[in-house]
Design a protein with these regions (language model features):
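Short beta-strand segments enriched in small/hydrophobic residues
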Residues: 12-17, 51-67, 168, 176-183
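N-terminal helix-turn-helix/winged-helix DNA-binding helices
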Residues: 38-76, 84-87, 95-97, 107-110
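N-terminal helix-turn-helix DNA-binding module of bacterial transcription factors
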Residues: 1-57, 329, 338
Length: 339
């Protein structure tokens, strides 16, 4: 923790609060400390003495990135529920990398943790999770709906959620829609978002154009770079769906820098409904994801497994909703004729 404190320019107490009570830390400080922890691939080891006891009181949690506020919301819910039940957390970030995620899972297995909460799947990693479960490790997968799965999960239908927001853009008469999406070649749930986007276009007789799809890490700078590319195309899209609000905020910045008005010249929609989405200029149309509720339910399921109260498969697919704000508008007839 001392190295994190030094690199982030904050006190050890602030680092501790970031880990234990992130809701008490200012947003800018929280993001700075989380970025340093992610850069160092830091894993917090709580109450290490529990490892020598018969039953551990530590739960492992793997999230894709500490930079995203939406994953922080899920982590906060798990942390609060864990504290109420006298459990502590080991939290790690996979950085959307399969080797990093497998390494974290192996560490958790070797430390004989009480259970694991895992954010979806990096492509190619599902078999290891099944091995852990068969070996007696309680495990709950979050942030995705797993079809034909023998694993407990709490998530939502990424395919359907993306289909709906794409269909909303189509209802505004957009026919030339760009997509800025996370690492779909690495992450199963992100791949399903791409598939939902494609399916909505096909269902409405629209052609899928790979040139309008840009794969990026879900960061502000990547969202800005991707949007700049889309706006520089000979025929640019009339609407852009960013498959995370972080990417969408970056896209808004790019449009502003290039003097492209939102929504007058181009519509932009996001995904997640993080807190800042409502305060963007213009406020961001997006998909509301029950991030906090996912964490609460996941811990409840895991606690039942740990206590031996439930050996049945539990699978929750929660609802999402399209939140309509000011960043999208219906196309005028003259624009449609040109697109």
């Amino acid at each position: 923790m001392a190295e994190i404190s030094k690199m982030a320019g904050v006190s050890l107490a602030t680092v501790s609060r970031t880990i234990h009570s992130p809701h008490l830390v200012r947003k800018g400080t929280l993001e700075r400390v989380n970025q340093v922890m992610e850069r160092l691939n830091y894993v917090y080891h709580a109450t290490a003495g529990d490892l020598s006891r018969k039953r551990s009181s530590i739960i492992g949690v793997i999230i894709p990135t500490a930079k995203s506020l939406v994953f922080s919301s899920t982590l906060q819910a798990i942390q609060e529920a864990a504290q109420q039940n006298n459990f502590s957390l080991v939290a790690g970030s996979s950085k959307y990398d399969i080797e990093t995620e497998l390494s974290l899972l192996q560490q958790f297995k070797e430390r004989r943790l009480a259970g694991i909460i895992l954010t979806g799947f990096v492509v190619g990693q599902k078999d290891l999770i099944k091995e852990l479960v068969k070996g007696g490790m309680p495990c709950v997968v979050i942030w995705d709906k797993l079809d034909d799965s023998d694993l407990s999960y709490v998530g939502f239908d990424n395919f359907k959620a993306t289909y709906r927001i794409t269909e909303y853009l189509i209802s505004l008469r957009h026919r030339h829609i760009g997509l800025i999406v996370g690492p779909y070649t690495k992450v199963e749930r992100v791949k399903r978002r791409l598939e939902g986007f494609k399916a909505a276009l096909t269902a409405h007789g629209l052609k899928f154009d790979p040139e309008l799809v840009i794969e990026k890490e879900p960061t502000l700078i990547d969202g800005k770079e991707a949007m700049s590319r889309l706006l520089s195309l000979p025929v640019r899209p009339t609407a852009v769906l960013a498959a995370s609000d972080t990417l969408a905020v970056g896209a808004l910045a790019a449009a502003r820098d290039m003097n492209v008005r939102v929504p007058e010249d181009i519509s932009i929609a996001g995904f997640d409904d993080i807190e800042v989405a409502a305060y963007c200029n213009p406020p961001l149309t997006t998909v509301r994801v029950p991030a906090y509720e996912i964490g609460q339910i996941a811990f409840k399921i895991l606690l039942g497994m740990i206590n031996g109260n439930s050996d049945q498969l539990q699978q929750y697919c929660l609802d999402t909703s399209v939140i309509i704000r000011g960043s999208c508008r219906e196309l005028d007839n003259d624009v449609i004729s040109k697109s």
